[in-house]
Amino acid sequence: LRSTQDPMSYLLGFDAGRPIQNSFGGPEIAGRPFYNEDFTRLNFDVRRGSLAQVLGEIADHLHDPRPPTYYVASLLVDGALPGFSQANGLPLAEHDIDAPPSIWIGNRVVASCHFDEPNNIACCAVGRRRFTLFPPDQIANLYPGPFDPTPGGQVVSVVDFDDPDHDRHPRF
């Protein structure tokens, strides 16, 4: 890759042009989609738009020290990016794995610790991403948040892993 624009252009080459769900948060959320102070609302907006719009907004803020947060979560590849799977796919069906491929696109976003129902294969193609895995018996020590609302459809840990409050979360 010569630049961040290269993978954006590559994705747009497969774009079906359908409206997609995407999320936006102002610079004040510092890339961390989460709850408000009393856990009654989320600190970001879910909207509908085009992939070109989202990628354009990401590109507009590539060099901002505190950019707004933009992401597209679990976009089903075959419907939104026809041909992408054939050009980049994992041969899952050859191994009797029935899993529709999805893609996650965003800028500097920190996803809170959560449990994904599907079995995932994670691959960071552009940029950097850290995945921290915990055994199931540690769930209580991760302080799960409320069932509704949720930042991504599943319950997330309320602990800020980058700045944990050990008084509020002593078992973390």
Residue map of PLM features:
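N-terminal accessory scaffold of Fe(II)-dependent oxygenases
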Residues: 1-172
